């Protein structure tokens, strides 16, 4: 029954955003309900962002689909996500990338996300409790880096951990609004490849809790 609901959810997403076949397949493979807190299970297959603990949110599935597709997913191997949250975005990425690395700074969210991902048998997803601004140097460089929270700027540590020619997608705070930008690394520096759309994400915060 859930897979039918998930399929219908993807139909709704595709009406609003033309899904790459790989992204659609990935979205249909991961049941969003698994990542939604119990009080909101009946909203799991809507296109709404839903509240979690610690003043955090599980992103709208439309947003997850867009952010995944904005990474330009063909012919890539590894991705680093900054801000694991519920684990839903990482789970979707796991259906496309061979290796997924995700960092979460809130320990309670990290513990829950890791358990969900393990329960689903997503062995290619690796989750770390740490400050995402420092990245995950052990497995660098990454073909892609995705911010699942809004940054004021991109830390040098993450630029260093991105493969030359690699792509980084992030919501960026600009004055009083947020915009999703796609960057490409050229000559060891990030260049804005495209400003994609306005958005609303929780902010990137330093440190752990």
UniProtKB/Swiss-Prot annotation:
Highest taxon listed in the record's lineage: Bacteria
UniProt keyword annotations, A-Z: Cytoplasm, Methyltransferase, S-adenosyl-L-methionine, Transferase
InterPro entries from the UniProt entry: PCMT, SAM-dependent_MTases_sf
EC number: 2.1.1.77
Main location class: cytoplasm
Any single Pfam family the record assigns to this protein: PCMT
Catalyzed reactions: [protein]-L-isoaspartate + S-adenosyl-L-methionine = [protein]-L-isoaspartate alpha-methyl ester + S-adenosyl-L-homocysteine
Active site: 59
One CC-aspect GO term: cytoplasm
PROSITE patterns: PCMT (PS01279)
Subcellular location: Cytoplasm
UniProt record, GO biological process: methylation; protein modification process; protein repair
MF GO annotations: protein-L-isoaspartate (D-aspartate) O-methyltransferase activity
Keyword Cytoplasm: yes
Gene3D superfamilies per the UniProt record, alphabetical: Vaccinia Virus protein VP39
Subunit structure, interactors included: Monomer.
NCBIfam families: pimt (TIGR00080), PRK00312.1 (NF001453)
Function: Catalyzes the methyl esterification of L-isoaspartyl residues in peptides and proteins that result from spontaneous decomposition of normal L-aspartyl and L-asparaginyl residues. It plays a role in the repair and/or degradation of damaged proteins.
Family named by the database record: Belongs to the methyltransferase superfamily. L-isoaspartyl/D-aspartyl protein methyltransferase family.
Name of the protein described by the UniProt record: Protein-L-isoaspartate O-methyltransferase
Biological source species: Helicobacter pylori (strain ATCC 700392 / 26695) (Campylobacter pylori)
């Amino acid at each position: 029954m859930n897979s039918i609901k998930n399929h219908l959810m993807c139909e709704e997403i595709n009406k609003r955003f033309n899904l790459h076949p790989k992204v659609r397949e990935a979205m249909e493979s991961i049941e969003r309900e698994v990542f939604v807190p119990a009080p909101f299970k009946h909203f799991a297959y809507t296109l709404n962002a839903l509240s979690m603990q610690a003043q955090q949110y599980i992103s709208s599935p439309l947003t997850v689909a867009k952010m995944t597709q904005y990474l330009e997913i063909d012919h890539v191997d590894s991705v680093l996500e900054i801000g694991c949250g519920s684990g839903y975005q990482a789970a979707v990425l796991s259906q496309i990338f061979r290796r997924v690395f995700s960092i979460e700074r809130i320990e309670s969210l990290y513990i829950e996300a890791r358990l969900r991902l393990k329960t689903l048998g997503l062995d290619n997803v690796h989750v770390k409790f740490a400050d995402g601004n420092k990245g995950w140097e052990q497995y660098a460089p990454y073909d892609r880096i995705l911010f699942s929270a809004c940054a004021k700027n991109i830390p040098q540590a993450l630029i260093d951990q991105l493969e030359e020619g690699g792509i980084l997608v992030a919501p960026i705070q600009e004055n009083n609004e947020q915009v999703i930008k796609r960057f490409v690394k050229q000559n060891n520096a990030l260049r804005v490849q495209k400003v994609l759309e306005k958005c609303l994400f929780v902010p990137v915060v330093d440190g752990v809790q």
